[in-house]
């Protein structure tokens, strides 16, 4: 992979997501079929208002969404995919291993392992301080 520093402004050029649903802050490594990105988790996240006010924990499904968005940055940054959308088509073998709380920095790693036409399969994992927080296999459909 190639070490890069893609900031949120550049991420927003690839992804259609916006606040409060943009869950990727920076890309730090990228290759043809692999990406590593960062999500800085703060108490200001809207989901913490209800999940849970006395014990804020990032919902696991949003960790998977952050991983999906990281993979989306990679796919939508390719010139042939400019202006297209990536749709979440499924999750398999998802495991949540560590609670993610305000102040954590999620390191998001996604690797495309299979493609067939507009469908792609990605192995993804999120870590905090080098410890696995979540992992799973994500399926995407590229469309307009």
Curated annotation (Swiss-Prot):
GO biological process terms on file:
fatty acid biosynthetic process; lipid A biosynthetic process
Does Cytoplasm count among this protein's keywords? yes
Q: Which InterPro entries match?
A: FabA_FabZ, FabZ, HotDog_dom_sf
Q: Name one Pfam family in it.
A: FabA
Q: Which residues cross the membrane?
A: none
One Gene Ontology term of the molecular function aspect: (3R)-hydroxyacyl-[acyl-carrier-protein] dehydratase activity
Keyword 4Fe-4S assigned: no
Entry GO CC: cytoplasm; membrane
Please state where this protein is localized: Cytoplasm
Keyword annotations for this protein? Cytoplasm, Lipid A biosynthesis, Lipid biosynthesis, Lipid metabolism, Lyase
Just give the chief location class. Answer: cytoplasm
User: What Gene3D superfamilies does the annotation carry?
Assistant: Hotdog Thioesterase
E.C. no? 4.2.1.59
* Top EC category: lyase
Q: Residues in the active site?
A: 51
Provide the catalytic activity annotation.
a (3R)-hydroxyacyl-[ACP] = a (2E)-enoyl-[ACP] + H2O
Membership in a protein family: Belongs to the thioester dehydratase family. FabZ subfamily.
Its job: Involved in unsaturated fatty acids biosynthesis. Catalyzes the dehydration of short chain beta-hydroxyacyl-ACPs and long chain saturated and unsaturated beta-hydroxyacyl-ACPs.
- The molecule here is called 3-hydroxyacyl-[acyl-carrier-protein] dehydratase FabZ
The species this protein was found in: Lactococcus lactis subsp. cremoris (strain SK11)
